[in-house]
Every structure is written in C-alpha cells, then in structure tokens.
C-alpha cells in the first residue's frame, strides 16, 4: 500500500509551494549548482516516504549589524509588509513560515536577532542548533559587509563546523542601480566565497528576490533533512507530523507488519 500524508492544519499559501529545485542568485557564489532535487529525495517524496522531514523545523538564524534590515526582510516574507516606522529588535524574536516542498509539509523557524552590541550575549544563546545562517548587510554601506565576518564567527562558535548552510545577503537593493550595484555585489560575492556562503541581493521594500531567496533556503534545508533521515532510518517506520497537524504516514515493510509476538495467534 502506498503511504500518504493528510494535511489537517491550514493550507500552505500558493507561493510557498515548491515543486522544483529553486535556482541560485548567481553561479559565482552558490552552495549547489544543481537544478534538481537529489534523486533519493525525489523518490522519497513521490512515495511520501520522507520520514521525519515533515516533523522537524529547520532553524534559521539571521544576524547582522543594526539597521541593515533583518526584521524588514523577515516581515516581507512572513507578513508581506514593509515597515516604514522601524523599531530595533530587542534581544531575539522569531517567526515560523510553512512551506510545501515536493508535496511534503515543511517549516522554517526564522530567528531575528538584535544587531546592537549590548544584546549580543542574549542573542548568542539562540544561535545553537541552527541549520541555516543568514548574514545580512546593507548594500549601500560597505562597513556592514565587513562586519559580517564577525557575525558569522559568532554563530559558528555555537554550532558544529560544517553543519550549517551559510548565506550572505545584501539588503536594500532598491537603493542601488547600474555600476554601483554591480560593484557592491562583486565585493560581496568575493567575501561570500571566502565564507563558503551563497550570495543573494534582496529588497524588503519592493519584495525583490525575497520569496525566491527563502524558497531556496527552504529547499536546501528540506533536502538535507530528508537525506539525513534516509541515512539513519530504522527498519520500521511510523506516522509522523509537523506539529501543526500535517501528517506523513510511512509504509511499514510487510516482513515487519505481519510479524506477531511468540504465542499469539488469531482469534
């Protein structure tokens, strides 16, 4: 019998449904150049055999200097608004954004951290367990780009080496054009390669590239979750959910399904 999942929570919005592997922003600084999901992931999704991928949230940590637009970026994604009356984040805040990837429910838990030095000790406690690190800077302020090195070091100090996807994101793209934008992006791409990060330019004000960027983040995190689950999967599977009522029912092999404890027979 083919396994299936039954969504019981609110439906995912249409622009959060991902059916094909999202493309990079620039091939000069991207984590993966491929254009399709891993074949094992595609097969698992087709058979709704993705294990705990629908159960887990991927933790995304967003860091960067004060006023680079971290909160505005997150609000554009989650609320589709741009805040003209900006208030600095105090400590940390987070949003949960639901996606459907190759037919499977999946969520990002996006942590918005304060850019002020005085809140660093508070925010650092929330860096642990990140699957994705987004280091944001202002495309119009080269100093904020230089500071991303330290922000990345701070987050990596709380996580295992090689365990996180790293993104370098230039904000306020709407304020630059032509040669000025090309120059700023060239410098950022150079740094992204040093960081082993994928680079994106976005605008929270206009919404340019915001949905595409987070779709890319979600797809990479989802694929990694499924592959990790396939590697450590036990012989018997069961039904799992994502905490919001989305269920994934995993098929149990017949050799296990039909086995009875000794001494038990049919009534």
Swiss-Prot record:
A motif (Switch 2) lies at residues 113-132. Its cofactor is Mg(2+). The keyword Nucleotide-binding applies. Its EC number is 3.6.5.2. One of its GO terms (biological process) is protein transport. It holds the Pfam family Ras. One of its GO terms (cellular component) is Golgi membrane. It is found in: Golgi apparatus membrane. Mg(2+) binds at residues 71, 89, 112. It catalyses: GTP + H2O = GDP + phosphate + H(+). It is a lipid-anchor. Keywords: Golgi apparatus, GTP-binding, Hydrolase, Lipoprotein, Magnesium, Membrane, Metal-binding, Nucleotide-binding, Prenylation, Protein transport, Transport. PANTHER family: RAS-RELATED PROTEIN RAB. Belongs to the small GTPase superfamily. Rab family. This is Ras-related protein Rab-36. It comes from Mus musculus (Mouse).
């Amino acid at each position: 019998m083919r396994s299936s999942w039954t969504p019981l929570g609110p439906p995912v919005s249409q622009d959060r449904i991902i059916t094909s592997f999202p493309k990079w922003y620039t091939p000069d600084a991207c984590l993966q150049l491929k254009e399709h999901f891993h074949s094992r992931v595609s097969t698992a999704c087709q058979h709704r055999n993705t294990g705990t991928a629908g159960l887990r949230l991927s933790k995304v940590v967003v860091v960067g200097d004060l006023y680079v637009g971290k909160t505005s970026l997150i609000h554009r994604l989650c609320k589709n608004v741009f805040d003209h009356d900006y208030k600095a984040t105090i400590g940390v805040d987070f949003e949960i954004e639901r996606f459907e990837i190759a037919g499977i429910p999946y969520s990002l838990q996006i942590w918005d951290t304060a850019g002020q030095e005085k809140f660093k000790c508070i925010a650092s406690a929330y860096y642990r367990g990140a699957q994705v690190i987004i280091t944001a800077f202002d495309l119009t302020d080269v100093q904020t780009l230089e500071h991303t090195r330290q922000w990345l070091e701070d987050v990596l100090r709380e996580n295992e080496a090689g365990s996180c996807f790293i993104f370098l994101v230039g904000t306020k793209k709407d304020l630059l054009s032509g040669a000025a934008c090309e120059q700023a992006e060239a410098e950022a791409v150079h740094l992204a390669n040093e960081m082993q990060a994928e680079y994106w330019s976005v605008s929270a004000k206009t919404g340019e590239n915001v949905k595409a960027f987070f779709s890319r983040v979600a797809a990479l995190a989802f694929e990694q979750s499924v592959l990790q689950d396939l590697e450590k999967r036990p012989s018997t599977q069961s039904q799992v959910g994502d905490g919001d009522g989305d269920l994934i029912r995993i098929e149990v092999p017949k050799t296990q399904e039909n086995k009875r404890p000794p001494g038990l027979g049919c009534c």
